[in-house]
From Swiss-Prot:
GO cellular component, one term: cytosolic small ribosomal subunit
Matching CDD domains: KH-II_30S_S3 (cd02412)
Superkingdom of the organism of origin: Bacteria
Organism: Rhodopseudomonas palustris (strain HaA2)
Protein keywords: Ribonucleoprotein, Ribosomal protein, RNA-binding, rRNA-binding
GO molecular function: mRNA binding; rRNA binding; structural constituent of ribosome
Function summary: Binds the lower part of the 30S subunit head. Binds mRNA in the 70S ribosome, positioning it for translation.
Keyword flag Transferase: no
UniProt xrefs under NCBIfam families: rpsC_bact
The name this protein goes by in its record: Small ribosomal subunit protein uS3
KH type-2 domain segment(s): 39-107
Family to which this protein belongs: Belongs to the universal ribosomal protein uS3 family.
Length: 232
Protein backbone atom coordinates (compact mmCIF):
# COMPACT_ATOMS: atom_id res chain seq x y z
CA UNK A 1 0.00 0.00 0.00
CA UNK A 2 2.84 2.37 0.84
CA UNK A 3 4.16 1.88 -2.70
CA UNK A 4 0.96 3.19 -4.30
CA UNK A 5 -0.46 5.88 -2.02
CA UNK A 6 0.65 9.52 -1.86
CA UNK A 7 3.32 9.49 0.91
CA UNK A 8 2.29 12.93 2.18
CA UNK A 9 -1.37 11.92 2.59
CA UNK A 10 -0.32 8.68 4.31
CA UNK A 11 1.65 10.64 6.95
CA UNK A 12 -0.85 13.43 7.67
CA UNK A 13 -1.32 13.70 11.43
CA UNK A 14 1.85 11.69 12.12
CA UNK A 15 4.80 13.83 11.04
CA UNK A 16 3.17 16.05 8.41
CA UNK A 17 0.28 18.49 8.64
CA UNK A 18 -2.15 20.00 6.14
CA UNK A 19 -1.33 22.96 3.90
CA UNK A 20 -4.72 24.54 4.71
CA UNK A 21 -4.76 25.13 8.46
CA UNK A 22 -8.15 26.42 9.53
CA UNK A 23 -11.50 25.22 10.82
CA UNK A 24 -14.98 26.30 9.73
CA UNK A 25 -18.57 25.27 10.30
CA UNK A 26 -20.56 23.44 7.61
CA UNK A 27 -22.09 26.69 6.32
CA UNK A 28 -18.71 28.32 5.66
CA UNK A 29 -16.51 25.32 4.88
CA UNK A 30 -17.33 24.93 1.18
CA UNK A 31 -16.89 28.64 0.44
CA UNK A 32 -13.51 28.82 2.21
CA UNK A 33 -12.31 25.62 0.50
CA UNK A 34 -13.10 27.09 -2.94
CA UNK A 35 -11.27 30.28 -1.92
CA UNK A 36 -8.18 28.20 -1.04
CA UNK A 37 -8.25 26.46 -4.44
CA UNK A 38 -8.56 29.79 -6.30
CA UNK A 39 -5.79 31.41 -4.22
CA UNK A 40 -3.40 28.55 -5.00
CA UNK A 41 -4.30 28.60 -8.71
CA UNK A 42 -3.63 32.35 -8.99
CA UNK A 43 -0.36 32.23 -7.03
CA UNK A 44 1.03 29.28 -9.02
CA UNK A 45 0.05 31.03 -12.26
CA UNK A 46 1.62 34.37 -11.27
CA UNK A 47 4.76 32.84 -9.72
CA UNK A 48 5.78 30.34 -12.41
CA UNK A 49 9.39 31.60 -12.37
CA UNK A 50 9.66 31.88 -8.57
CA UNK A 51 10.21 28.15 -7.82
CA UNK A 52 7.28 27.88 -5.39
CA UNK A 53 7.27 24.59 -3.48
CA UNK A 54 4.37 25.02 -1.03
CA UNK A 55 1.59 27.47 -0.28
CA UNK A 56 0.26 27.29 3.29
CA UNK A 57 -3.03 29.05 4.08
CA UNK A 58 -4.07 29.89 7.66
CA UNK A 59 -7.20 31.76 8.72
CA UNK A 60 -6.96 33.43 12.12
CA UNK A 61 -9.87 35.69 13.13
CA UNK A 62 -11.02 37.71 10.06
CA UNK A 63 -7.64 37.27 8.37
CA UNK A 64 -6.18 35.14 5.59
CA UNK A 65 -2.48 34.44 6.13
CA UNK A 66 -0.72 33.01 3.07
CA UNK A 67 2.82 31.63 3.47
CA UNK A 68 4.73 31.07 0.22
CA UNK A 69 7.72 28.70 0.36
CA UNK A 70 9.96 29.73 -2.53
CA UNK A 71 13.55 29.20 -3.68
CA UNK A 72 13.54 32.69 -5.27
CA UNK A 73 11.91 35.12 -2.81
CA UNK A 74 13.28 38.12 -4.74
CA UNK A 75 11.08 37.19 -7.72
CA UNK A 76 8.03 37.00 -5.44
CA UNK A 77 8.70 40.35 -3.73
CA UNK A 78 9.72 42.29 -6.84
CA UNK A 79 11.36 45.71 -6.96
CA UNK A 80 10.62 47.57 -3.70
CA UNK A 81 7.82 45.09 -2.95
CA UNK A 82 5.78 46.03 -6.03
CA UNK A 83 5.02 42.46 -7.12
CA UNK A 84 3.91 41.31 -3.68
CA UNK A 85 1.50 44.25 -3.47
CA UNK A 86 -0.08 43.12 -6.75
CA UNK A 87 -0.36 39.56 -5.41
CA UNK A 88 -2.01 40.80 -2.22
CA UNK A 89 -4.60 42.74 -4.23
CA UNK A 90 -5.39 39.70 -6.40
CA UNK A 91 -5.81 37.47 -3.34
CA UNK A 92 -7.93 40.16 -1.64
CA UNK A 93 -10.32 40.07 -4.64
CA UNK A 94 -11.02 36.40 -3.88
CA UNK A 95 -11.55 36.54 -0.12
CA UNK A 96 -13.34 39.00 2.13
CA UNK A 97 -10.71 38.58 4.88
CA UNK A 98 -7.68 40.83 5.41
CA UNK A 99 -4.77 39.29 3.49
CA UNK A 100 -1.27 38.86 4.93
CA UNK A 101 1.45 37.32 2.73
CA UNK A 102 4.62 35.84 4.23
CA UNK A 103 7.57 34.47 2.28
CA UNK A 104 9.90 31.67 3.40
CA UNK A 105 13.09 31.12 1.42
CA UNK A 106 14.08 27.52 0.66
CA UNK A 107 17.87 27.51 0.83
CA UNK A 108 18.31 23.97 -0.50
CA UNK A 109 15.92 23.52 -3.43
CA UNK A 110 17.78 20.30 -4.34
CA UNK A 111 16.17 18.68 -1.25
CA UNK A 112 12.60 19.78 -2.06
CA UNK A 113 10.76 17.10 -4.06
CA UNK A 114 8.38 19.53 -5.80
CA UNK A 115 11.20 21.80 -6.96
CA UNK A 116 13.31 18.83 -8.11
CA UNK A 117 10.36 17.47 -10.14
CA UNK A 118 9.72 20.88 -11.73
CA UNK A 119 13.41 21.28 -12.56
CA UNK A 120 13.50 17.90 -14.34
CA UNK A 121 10.25 18.72 -16.20
CA UNK A 122 11.74 22.02 -17.42
CA UNK A 123 14.87 20.20 -18.63
CA UNK A 124 12.73 17.67 -20.53
CA UNK A 125 10.93 20.58 -22.23
CA UNK A 126 14.34 21.94 -23.28
CA UNK A 127 15.16 18.50 -24.77
CA UNK A 128 17.85 17.63 -22.22
CA UNK A 129 18.41 13.84 -22.12
CA UNK A 130 16.08 12.47 -19.43
CA UNK A 131 18.71 10.12 -17.96
CA UNK A 132 21.16 12.97 -17.56
CA UNK A 133 18.52 15.18 -15.88
CA UNK A 134 17.52 12.39 -13.47
CA UNK A 135 21.11 11.47 -12.61
CA UNK A 136 22.09 15.09 -11.99
CA UNK A 137 19.13 15.59 -9.62
CA UNK A 138 19.95 12.39 -7.71
CA UNK A 139 23.61 13.35 -7.29
CA UNK A 140 22.74 16.88 -6.09
CA UNK A 141 20.24 15.60 -3.49
CA UNK A 142 22.60 12.95 -2.11
CA UNK A 143 25.48 15.43 -1.96
CA UNK A 144 23.39 17.85 0.14
CA UNK A 145 22.42 15.25 2.76
CA UNK A 146 19.41 13.27 1.52
CA UNK A 147 19.37 9.68 2.79
CA UNK A 148 17.64 8.45 -0.35
CA UNK A 149 15.90 9.64 -3.51
CA UNK A 150 13.77 8.03 -6.21
CA UNK A 151 12.75 9.62 -9.51
CA UNK A 152 10.18 8.28 -12.00
CA UNK A 153 9.82 9.67 -15.53
CA UNK A 154 7.05 8.41 -17.80
CA UNK A 155 5.79 9.22 -21.29
CA UNK A 156 7.37 9.37 -24.75
CA UNK A 157 10.86 9.76 -23.32
CA UNK A 158 13.40 10.96 -25.87
CA UNK A 159 10.65 11.11 -28.51
CA UNK A 160 10.17 7.32 -28.54
CA UNK A 161 7.16 5.93 -30.44
CA UNK A 162 5.98 3.90 -27.45
CA UNK A 163 5.52 5.54 -24.04
CA UNK A 164 7.35 3.94 -21.15
CA UNK A 165 8.44 4.57 -17.57
CA UNK A 166 12.06 4.89 -16.40
CA UNK A 167 13.17 5.26 -12.78
CA UNK A 168 16.36 5.88 -10.90
CA UNK A 169 16.99 5.40 -7.17
CA UNK A 170 19.88 5.94 -4.80
CA UNK A 171 19.95 5.30 -1.05
CA UNK A 172 16.88 4.24 0.98
CA UNK A 173 13.29 5.35 0.35
CA UNK A 174 11.19 3.39 2.92
CA UNK A 175 7.63 4.18 1.77
CA UNK A 176 6.00 1.81 4.31
CA UNK A 177 7.73 3.39 7.34
CA UNK A 178 5.33 5.98 8.75
CA UNK A 179 7.99 7.72 10.86
CA UNK A 180 10.12 8.33 7.74
CA UNK A 181 10.34 11.98 6.65
CA UNK A 182 9.57 11.57 2.94
CA UNK A 183 8.95 14.53 0.67
CA UNK A 184 6.97 13.89 -2.54
CA UNK A 185 6.48 16.04 -5.61
CA UNK A 186 5.05 15.72 -9.11
CA UNK A 187 5.38 17.79 -12.28
CA UNK A 188 4.35 17.57 -15.94
CA UNK A 189 6.62 18.35 -18.88
CA UNK A 190 4.82 19.58 -22.02
CA UNK A 191 7.11 18.43 -24.85
CA UNK A 192 6.60 18.44 -28.62
CA UNK A 193 6.00 14.66 -28.44
CA UNK A 194 3.32 14.91 -25.72
CA UNK A 195 3.28 15.18 -21.94
CA UNK A 196 5.79 13.45 -19.68
CA UNK A 197 5.13 12.91 -15.98
CA UNK A 198 7.83 13.30 -13.31
CA UNK A 199 7.51 11.96 -9.74
CA UNK A 200 10.12 12.48 -7.01
CA UNK A 201 10.45 10.93 -3.53
CA UNK A 202 13.17 12.26 -1.17
CA UNK A 203 13.93 10.51 2.15
CA UNK A 204 15.44 12.92 4.70
CA UNK A 205 15.69 10.67 7.76
CA UNK A 206 13.28 9.51 10.47
CA UNK A 207 11.13 11.60 12.82
CA UNK A 208 10.70 9.54 15.99
CA UNK A 209 8.29 11.76 17.94
CA UNK A 210 4.58 11.78 17.05
CA UNK A 211 4.18 15.42 15.99
CA UNK A 212 2.19 16.57 12.93
CA UNK A 213 4.28 19.78 12.85
CA UNK A 214 7.61 17.89 13.01
CA UNK A 215 8.49 18.39 9.35
CA UNK A 216 7.79 22.14 9.51
CA UNK A 217 9.91 22.46 12.67
CA UNK A 218 12.75 20.53 11.06
CA UNK A 219 12.68 22.88 8.06
CA UNK A 220 12.67 25.96 10.31
CA UNK A 221 15.50 24.74 12.56
CA UNK A 222 17.71 23.24 9.83
CA UNK A 223 19.34 24.74 6.77
CA UNK A 224 16.37 24.17 4.47
CA UNK A 225 14.82 27.58 5.10
CA UNK A 226 15.70 31.02 6.35
CA UNK A 227 13.56 32.95 8.86
CA UNK A 228 10.34 34.08 7.25
CA UNK A 229 9.90 37.61 5.96
CA UNK A 230 6.62 39.33 6.75
CA UNK A 231 5.02 41.26 3.93
CA UNK A 232 1.90 42.52 5.64
Amino acid sequence: MGQKINPIGLRLGINRTWDSRWFAGKNEYGKLLHEDVKIREILHKELKQAAVARIVIERPHKKCRVTIHSARPGVVIGKKGADIDKLRKKVADITASDVVINIVEIRKPELDATLVAESIAQQLERRVAFRRAMKRAVQSAMRLGAEGIRINCSGRLGGAEIARMEWYREGRVPLHTLRADIDYGVATAFTTFGTCGVKVWIFKGEILEHDPMAQDKRMAEGDNSRPRRDAA
